[in-house]
């Protein structure tokens, strides 16, 4: 499905945190747009909200199950306003969607710089005691520190790079070997 085609009806089954400008742009993509401001309580509520919509938007707080989708045969597209890394980690039944010709997309690689900035700033606060008691009696630098990173995806890789920039020794755990990380 080309998501630039016009939909009949777009339903955001829960708050999806769109800025007002982009919420307005949704109206150019469908004849009708319905945005719910609360989190649905179960599959029946979700199915009722979707109704005859052909486009569904959701965030990370609700699950779009096979049971709910089966009650809504018009669904052609599900937009996850959150991360989609794998069918196993998704809050949408990706396998059901694929088997029924429903296109599902999510967001990848967003906010990574902010995550890295937060991790580095909190580590510096902890090591130096800025605004809180210091980790040890004497402030420490990141240089020479042994840092472990769990998960070497986009954010984890950027955190490892930032720590390496400051002179830390990096160790990581990931589901598979990361040759690029080993070479750094």
Functional labels for PLM-detected ranges:
Residues 1-55, 167, 171, 179-180:
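N-terminal glycine-/charge-rich "phosphate-binding" loop or analogous flexible N-terminal tail
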Residues 7, 75, 143-146:
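Phosphate-coordination loops involved in phosphoryl transfer and adenosine-cofactor binding
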Residues 15-18, 38-41, 59-64, 83-86, ...:
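Short beta->alpha connector loops
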Residues 25, 118, 158, 162:
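Rossmann-fold NAD(P)-dependent oxidoreductase module
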Residues 26, 48-49, 68-71, 141:
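Structural alpha-helical scaffold elements that stabilize or flank donor/cofactor-binding regions
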Residues 43-46, 65-68, 138:
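Acidic, amphipathic alpha-helical patches
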Residues 54-134:
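Phosphate/diphosphate ligand-binding glycine-rich loop within oxidoreductases
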Residues 138-184:
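Rossmann-like dinucleotide/phosphate-binding beta-alpha-beta segment
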């Amino acid at each position: 499905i080309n998501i630039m085609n016009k939909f009949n009806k777009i339903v955001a089954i829960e708050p999806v945190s769109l800025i007002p400008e982009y919420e307005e742009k949704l109206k150019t993509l469908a004849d009708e747009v319905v945005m719910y401001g609360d989190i649905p309580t179960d599959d029946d509520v979700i199915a009722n909200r979707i109704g005859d919509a052909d486009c569904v938007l959701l965030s990370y707080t609700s699950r779009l199950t096979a049971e709910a989708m089966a009650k809504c045969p018009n669904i052609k597209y599900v937009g996850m306003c959150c991360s989609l890394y794998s069918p196993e980690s998704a809050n949408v039944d990706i396998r059901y969607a694929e088997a029924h010709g429903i296109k599902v997309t999510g967001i990848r690689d967003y906010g990574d710089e902010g995550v890295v900035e937060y991790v580095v700033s909190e580590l510096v606060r902890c090591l130096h005691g800025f605004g809180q008691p210091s980790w040890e009696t004497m402030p420490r630098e990141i240089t020479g520190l042994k840092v472990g990173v769990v998960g070497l995806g986009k954010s984890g890789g950027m955190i490892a790079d930032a720590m390496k920039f400051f002179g830390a020794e990096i160790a990581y755990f990931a589901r598979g070997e990361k040759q690029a990380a080993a070479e750094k």
